[in-house]
Amino acid sequence: CCNTCAFCVSVGEKPIRTLSIDSIRRRLQIIHEHGIKNVRVLDRTFNYNARRAKELLQLFLEFPDIRFHLEIHPALLSEELKEELRRLPQGLLHLEAGIQSLREPVLKQSRRMGKLSDALAGLELHCSLPNMEPHAALIAGLPHYHLNEYFEEVYPLAGYNAGEIQLESLKLLPGTEMRRQAETLGIHYSPFPPYEVLETNEISVGELQTARQLSRLLDGFYNTPAWHALTRELILNDKTFLHKFLEYLIRINLIDQPMSLEKRGLILYEYCKQNCPEYQTQASIAWIE
C-alpha cells in the first residue's frame, strides 16, 4: 500500500509492486469460468495510482456479472477517476471508503495520508452517485479518539447517506508502528490474537465496550437495507437519537443478542411508539415492506 498508516501491516516496501493488466485479465477469466460472482481486491488503496485504477475499472467492465469489492482512499481521488466512477454501471462495484476518523489529530497520529477535507469531499461525491453505495469505515481505539466523537461522527456520514457506516475496533498487529509505540501512546491491548485494543489514554475499557455496542446498533439498523432509511432519518433529525436508542437496547437486554430482521423492525417500531410517535407510521410501513 502507498499509505503510511501506523496501525496497518500493509505499509511495506516502495514502490508498490503491481500485476500486469493482462495477467489480471487471465485470472478474472478463470474466476468467471468457475461462476464466482464476487471478487475482493485486496489492495488497501485501490486508487493510489489514478491511471492504473482507471485501467482496472475498464477491465472490470469486461466482467459485468462479477461484483468487485474495492477499498479506496477518498482523499486521493483525481478528477479523471471521479468521471470514470460516474460512468460505471450500477452494481459493478462495492466501495469501502477508508475514512478512519473525522478528527485531524487522530489522523495525524495515525500517519494517514491526504487531507481530511479532501477525504470528505471524495466521500460526498461517491454518496451522490446513483450507481454507487459506498461504505464508510471508522476505527475505534485510535489514539486521541474519544467515545463521544464516535457518536458525533456518525451524523455527518449519515448526512452524506453512506450506504453503510462501519465502526471497527483497532487491532495492534505485530510489526506495526503503532504496536511498537503502544506504551508511549498509552494503548493497552490484548496479548492474544486479534490483539484488540482494550483501552487508551482517551477511552476506558467500558467506553470501548460502548463503542462495540454502537457498532452493533449501526450494523443491525443503519446498515440493514430494510431499516436504513428510517434509522438515517432518526439520526439526522435528533443528534441524541443514537445515545437514546442504544440506552433503550441495553435496557431491554437486546444489544448483545442476535436479532432477526423482523425482531429489529418490531424493536424500532416500539422505540418510535414510546419516544418519537411522529415516526410510528413510517416504522410500520418499513416493517410491512
Regions found by a protein language model. Give the residues of each.
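Acidic/polar loop patches that form or flank catalytic/metal-binding clefts of enzymes
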Residues: 39, 68, 134, 163-167, ...
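Canonical Radical SAM [4Fe-4S] cluster-binding loop centered on the CxxxCxxC motif
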Residues: 1-22
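Conserved residues at the C-terminal ends of beta-strands
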Residues: 11, 42, 168
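Flexible glycine/acidic-rich beta-alpha junction loops that bind and position SAM and/or redox cofactors
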Residues: 3, 50-51, 99, 105-110, ...
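Catalytic cores of alpha/beta
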Residues: 80-85, 143-161
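Short, hinge-like loop/turn segments at secondary-structure boundaries
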Residues: 57-59, 86-88, 153, 181-186
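Radical SAM enzyme core and accessory elements
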Residues: 214-289
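Conserved SAM/AdoMet-binding glycine-rich loop
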Residues: 21-143
